[in-house]
Amino acid sequence: MKGLPTAVTLFKKDMGIMDKRRKIKATAAYSLVQIGTWAYYAVILSFAGNYLKEHGFTDSGVGLLLGAAAAVSFVLQILFAELVSRLKRLTMYTVGIASAIVMAACSAAVLSDMTVLAIGCYFIACSLLQALPGIGNTIGMEAIEAGSPTAYSVARGMGSLGYSIFAYVTGLLVASMGIRMVSYLGLVVSAIMLAGLFLYSSEIRTGSAASVTKEARSGGFFRQNKAFFIFLVGAVFLCINHNLITCFLYRIMLFKQGTAADQGLAAGISAIVEVPIMFLFPYIAKRIPCKALVCFSGLWFAVKSLCCFIVSTPGGMFVASALQIFSWGLYSIAAVDHVSKLVPAGETVRAQSYLASAAPIGGFISMLCGGFILDSLGVQALLLISTVCGLIGAAFILVSVIKKDRGKDSNCLNAN
């Protein structure tokens, strides 16, 4: 009898070790998915201006093409969400695999000497990659809701770390070896993305159909979730703010007396500072209400843009880039968790897809207008407009939070 407690204790210890191993394995695999997702942004979208400029595009032309890509991405995200909601055999996992394969094909085709083919494939890549965050977030949130021990905030932090590394490396390689390096790095990122999806397959299959039936039948989604709709409007304005800087960072850096290498370093700094806040998010969310974190992060979008406006050197831009720890770094993780609580559990796929669609909508508006603003008014006007959009976005998010949570806070998934 004396040995029984010891046996039970050992069994519990072994189970605890197994749970930890599963958590590490699941988080590592999902981290590869997030790294692939955000590394695409660092390699292809961040250097789209460089690539298109080399092919004879003006700032307005770059803005129009990237704006069109964002519009296509918005349509793709809504299409993917509706198809997954209605077709039981189609999952976001399948969509993710297919998307990574298409991205690999487009990355290879960008090397073509046929300008029309190369530009066309670059356009497809820019469109599809903007749908990847929604796909990845839906995969992760479904798996977590179905019982997966995946640490989302850690994986998302690894995604930012991957963005930082690839942005810095891409900047160096483009400056020294030419814009064609974007294609080779795109193939590397595709391999990472596919590896992550295959390794994570055992976690996501359990939750892939969790929210299909209810979502397919529900009508008037926005009418039933008014606070979410207001939040989504705010998210669009924040994405306009964010994209006006990231998508035209090359022109901004040139105005601040910098180079393509400085552009890559600034982008890398913006991403690397996100990592600590994402890793620490589970602990922060236990002490600070999630709604407060979302509102706080919204204000910092405007603060960062204003700092970019004030500084006049590459060094100043590096300092301004570091402020992303409190803007996009905190927002991107807090918003995903907050939205999961704004809507019923059965509508997670649709809500996450709409949240992710805020990025291409904001991208479409910012890229459509950004090029014309640069050509007609200049860099400083672009940064001022970005600041105003940040303030408007923060205001909408505050209204959404007040409307939804009057006296009751929404708990964050990653605080559990």
Annotate each language-model stretch with its function.
Residues M92-C106, A292-C307, T387:
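Structural signature of the two symmetry-related core transmembrane helices
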Residues V349-S376:
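A late C-terminal transmembrane helix in Major Facilitator Superfamily
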Residues L76-R89, V174, I277-P289, L374-D375:
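Helix-to-loop junctions at the C-terminal end of transmembrane segments
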Residues I35, T115-P133, V236, G316-L330:
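Hydrophobic core of transmembrane alpha-helices in multi-pass small-molecule transporters
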Residues D14-I24, Y200-V233:
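Juxtamembrane intracellular "pre-TM" segments in multi-pass secondary transporters
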Residues K20-A70, A227-A235, C239-A266:
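Helix-loop boundary and gating motifs at the non-cytosolic
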Residues F123-M158:
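Cytoplasmic helix-loop-helix junction between adjacent transmembrane helices
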Residues D59-S60, A146-M158, A260-A261, V343-L355:
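Loop-to-transmembrane helix entry/capping segments in MFS-fold secondary transporters
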